[in-house]
Curated annotation (Swiss-Prot):
Family to which the UniProt record says this protein belongs: Belongs to the MscL family.
Pfam families: MscL (PF01741)
The keyword tRNA processing is annotated on this UniProt entry: no
HAMAP family assigned: MscL
Localisation: Cell inner membrane
Gene: mscL
Lineage top rank: taxon: Bacteria
MF terms in GO: mechanosensitive monoatomic ion channel activity
Membrane topology summary: Multi-pass membrane protein
Protein's name in the database: Large-conductance mechanosensitive channel
Oligomer status and interactors: Homopentamer.
Keyword hit for Transmembrane: yes
Chain ranges passing through the membrane: 9-29, 79-99
Cysteine disulfide partners in this protein: none
Length: 139
């Protein structure tokens, strides 16, 4: 039972749960960006450069023979993937930049010193009284 309890404690830690949520949201965000690039950005871009469908751009290295498919370099799909990456990287950069700005604002905000406890206040008063007594005794 010890291993099971240790795993349970590990799995419910904030960092592990936060990481899992981040991975799930990141995967969903990646799908959204892929659709945005493939369905929204690339068609008008292809139209502007002469009606080219980027996903069909490829160099055939060896033609198909019978049941053997053609060997191609699908550089159009690669271009779409690069654009996906650039958009995701930019979105992550902007998110990290916003988080860092919030952290800097929190760090700059002045913190009020904690109110001393009654015991600390009493000890401070005793210390001050002893200092004044010692100063009065010295010639």
């Amino acid at each position: 039972m010890g291993v099971l309890n240790e795993f349970k404690a590990f799995a419910v830690k904030g960092n592990v749960v936060d990481m899992a949520v981040g991975i799930i949201i990141g995967a969903a965000f990646g799908k959204i960006v892929s659709s945005f690039v493939g369905d929204v950005i690339m068609p008008p871009l292809g139209l502007l450069i002469g009606g080219v469908d980027f996903s069909d751009l490829a160099i055939t290295l060896k033609a198909a023979e019978g049941d053997v498919p053609a060997v191609v370099l699908a550089y159009g799909k690669f271009i779409q993937t690069v654009i996906d990456f650039v958009i995701v990287a930019f979105a992550i950069f902007m998110g990290v930049k916003a988080i860092n700005k919030l952290k800097r604002e929190e760090a700059v905000a002045p913190t009020t010193p904690p109110v001393p406890s009654a015991e600390e206040t009493l000890l401070t008063e005793i210390r001050d009284l002893l200092k004044t007594q010692n100063q009065n005794r010295l010639p």
